[in-house]
């Protein structure tokens, strides 16, 4: 990841939840975002197939009320730091049995942003005084997300 991109992610986590992250956190973060997008896309694919379609549309994505609110929060933060182009490159488009519509692909960066805001807030839920997430914090938060998404 470029130095400028690293600085934007660091700023994002400070704005979203007053967290200080480092390079090792950013590797875990990238893996996390891609894993969760893949999980959402698997459910979207099942919805599209169940409805007899061969393309995944935005309404197939299982976006909960909470995630939608985090996407809105991401948009407000993104106005300050312009992270969306970096998330567009970061958010993997894993090959599935069905294709994605252009509208679905266009939503990937904002979904990644919403997941990112939820991640940042989750650290504060497990430890309100946390400033610098450690491995144990990452493991706890990842287990929680695996239970829910």
Which residues are covered by each model-predicted region?
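Terminal helix-to-tail segments of small alpha-helical proteins
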Residues: 1-149
């Amino acid at each position: 990841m470029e130095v400028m991109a690293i600085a934007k992610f660091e700023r994002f986590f400070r704005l979203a939840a007053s967290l200080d992250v480092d390079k090792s956190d950013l590797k875990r973060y990238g893996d996390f975002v891609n894993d969760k997008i893949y999980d959402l896309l698997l459910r979207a694919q099942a919805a599209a197939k169940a409805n007899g379609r061969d393309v995944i549309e935005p309404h197939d994505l299982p976006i909960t009320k909470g995630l939608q609110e985090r996407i809105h929060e991401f948009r407000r933060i993104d106005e300050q730091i312009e992270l969306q182009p970096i998330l567009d490159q970061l958010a993997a488009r894993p090959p599935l049995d069905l294709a994605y519509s252009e509208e679905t692909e266009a939503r990937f960066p904002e979904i990644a942003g919403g997941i990112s805001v939820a991640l940042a807030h989750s650290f504060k839920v497990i430890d309100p005084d946390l400033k610098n997430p450690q491995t144990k914090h990452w493991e706890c938060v990842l287990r929680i997300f695996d239970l829910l998404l």
